[in-house]
Amino acid sequence: MSKLIIFAPQCGGNHLANMIGASQNLDNCLNLQEIELAYQNDKNASHTHMNEFFINEMISYTVTIKNNSIYVGHLDEVWNNWDRLKDKIKDVLVIDLSKKAQETIRKNKITYLESCSYTKEFIEKLFPNWNVESIHLDDLFGNADMLKFILDGTSFSLDNRCVKLHNIWLKKIKDSK
């Protein structure tokens, strides 16, 4: 079975998948050293998927969902691909937008619909066969050690080596404001 991260645009889902995939040596992900090198040398690398795991590519039906992999997508993309995903995905992590996001790139841009849709409760109702976990947007854009602590004990745990990668990503976010 594979994992899925559901997130709203500009909410760090690709970066989170890069870290989780590398930490857990998932089949469709690069290793941490390769990702770190890309993050340091390509200003856009930390804002995109580093390999084939964007669920939007499923629409073309050319990408097959593999076991021991991680995929990412926005809610509408996941919904549109439900028939192809339902039996291949087990664990889902949603980046939760339910509370007011404080210091993130999406500040003042989160819509009411997003704040209601990107929650653990909503995703559990929409996709009842999946094990759903959540992390709040502010926690993702915060301290790497706290992020690791929050994800420990879930199927989305992070390796200690992700701290440096997360700090590179946060610096890029802050420098782009």
Question: For the regions a protein language model found, what residue spans apply to each?
Answer:
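PAPS-dependent sulfotransferase catalytic domain
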Residues: M1-N108, E114-F122
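The conserved 3'-phosphoadenosine-5'-phosphosulfate
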Residues: Q33-N44, K109-Y112, Y118, F122-K177
